[in-house]
């Protein structure tokens, strides 16, 4: 282990820690991320295989209470309305993340004006669009060009290609295609 001093120490290289490290990477600062758990090879990510739906029930399940890996510790969330979704390793819970970051639709910012409910946002979609773009580049969002869930003007291809559909997803896609329904 190096004993060289560091300028920035980041505890946890999950979504927040990795975003901070990414934003500082082009500086001349010496950055160190400490993480509980091991490296997971990208080839081992469950989202890279068609059996990912089954793998989510085992070593890549959301709850450390179910996984019980050596790096896991029990979490008591019985009194919480929020169930734990945690993973200990470089990347943290982003290891469980399938690069799905749906954008709000432009009309979501104008619910009062359009639907007479709640309040309109103090900003609009176009104000957030550059930040959506940055997040998608940084986190490696995948998808299909033209997906209406990701409104972009002009339309752009997501930074990464779509993840493979699981066996259930392929079955549903075939059924939707047979019916002429839009499935993505």
Regions found by a protein language model. Give the residues of each.
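N-terminal glycine-rich phosphate/pyrophosphate-binding loop and immediately adjacent elements
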Residues: 1-113, 117, 122-126, 130-134
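Conserved redox-cofactor binding core of oxidoreductases
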Residues: 72-74, 100-103, 112-184
């Amino acid at each position: 282990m190096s004993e060289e001093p560091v300028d920035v120490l980041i505890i946890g290289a999950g979504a927040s820690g990795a975003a901070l490290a990414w934003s500082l990477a082009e500086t001349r600062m010496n950055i160190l991320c400490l993480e509980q758990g091991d490296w997971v090879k990208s080839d081992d990510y469950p989202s890279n295989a068609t059996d990912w739906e089954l793998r989510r029930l085992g070593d890549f399940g959301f709850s450390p209470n179910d996984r019980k890996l050596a790096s896991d510790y029990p979490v008591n969330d019985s009194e919480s309305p929020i169930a734990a979704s945690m993973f200990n390793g470089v990347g943290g819970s982003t290891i469980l993340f399938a690069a799905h970051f749906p954008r709000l639709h432009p009309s979501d910012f104008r619910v009062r004006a359009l639907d007479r409910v709640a309040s309109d946002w103090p900003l609009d979609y176009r104000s957030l669009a550059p930040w959506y773009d940055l997040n998608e580049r940084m986190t490696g969002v995948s998808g299909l060009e033209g997906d209406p869930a990701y409104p972009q003007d002009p339309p752009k291809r997501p930074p990464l290609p779509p993840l493979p559909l699981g066996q259930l997803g392929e079955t549903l896609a075939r059924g939707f295609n047979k019916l002429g329904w839009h499935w993505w």
